[in-house]
Amino acid sequence: MKLWQRNTIGAAVSVAACAVIVTTDLWPDWANYREATHTDNVVAVGAVGDADGQTWQVDSIRHLNTVRGIGGSGLPQGTVLNVVTVERTGTPTEIGCTGVITDGERRWSAEAVGGYGDLPPQGISSICGTPGPVQFSFLLPDDVVPTAVDVTTAQGRILVRLQL
């Protein structure tokens, strides 16, 4: 067999091996990453949208400089607590979810109710496993202008992006 034939066979085997590695090892991680940063389920400002068998809409956004509830502690210097209440109807299909707020470049996860999270009013939940409205609290630097809230599954997949 000539040298160029061996080189051609070697190149073909290398390309096939790379394709197998990308398909079996890298592609699932890349797909998980894409699901955690991009979604087709986007609800415009003031609109109502359908996603994951439910309807979603931003009900209210509050900006707080103290936390209600146990202790009512002050927030760290240079921060503000953004409290977003999301109105939703339908039966939740996910046992758990959380909120992630973004300014288009950076992302912040919702605070726990026991931390800086604001206590939800009667009739509003801080967990997604129950039907009805849900509230997310985000401790952000005071110069951040959030553009959207992503409601994500426990695995990080975005269910719906609610533009602010």
Describe the function of each predicted region:
Residues 1-83, 87-164:
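Conserved functional micro-motifs across diverse proteins
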